[in-house]
Amino acid sequence: MSKHFKGALIAGFALFAAAAPMLAHHSFAAEYDANKTVTVKGTINRLEWVNPHAYVFVDVKDASGKVTTWAFESLSPNALSRQGWNRNSLRQGEEVTVEGYMAKDGKPLADGSIHANSRSITRADGRKVFVGSSADEVPSK
């Protein structure tokens, strides 16, 4: 093997290794179904202000009183911060209506919550919080 070939091989491997994390990040179309919209009304159970995406967990009670937790993925904390939001913009126990899109695989997350992507969250007072990556417009705070 020539010296130049070895150098090119090592450089190519290093470039691939550096790019792998970027290639691993999912896209909306790969994980969510834009044709399967969902709207749920419930109470915020918890918020996860973590990278690469923040999550809002909402407890939804059905007619029989059974509670189901929905896990709504949103934008990154950085993107939400640039829109003027922070980890305290929504509070645990707050009543909200969430619009979003179902996960394509239909499988719950490890904690059993229903997985979806959030487009917007509407507070009880009617103010909308933009949180998703698929909305056409960003509602004002």
Spans of model-derived segments:
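Bacterial N-terminal signal peptides that target proteins for export
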Residues: M1-G12
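Bacterial N-terminal signal peptides
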Residues: I10-P21
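Short boundary/loop segments of OB/S1/cold-shock single-stranded nucleic-acid-binding domains
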Residues: L23-V38
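Conserved hydrophobic positions within beta-strands
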Residues: V40-I44
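Short aromatic-glycine-enriched beta-strand elements
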Residues: V50-V60
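Short, structured beta-strand/loop micro-motifs enriched in basic residues and often containing a Trp
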Residues: S74-R82
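Short nucleic-acid-contacting surface segments enriched for D/E, G, S/T with interspersed K/R
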Residues: R82-V98
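OB-fold/S1-family single-stranded nucleic acid-binding modules
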Residues: A103-S133
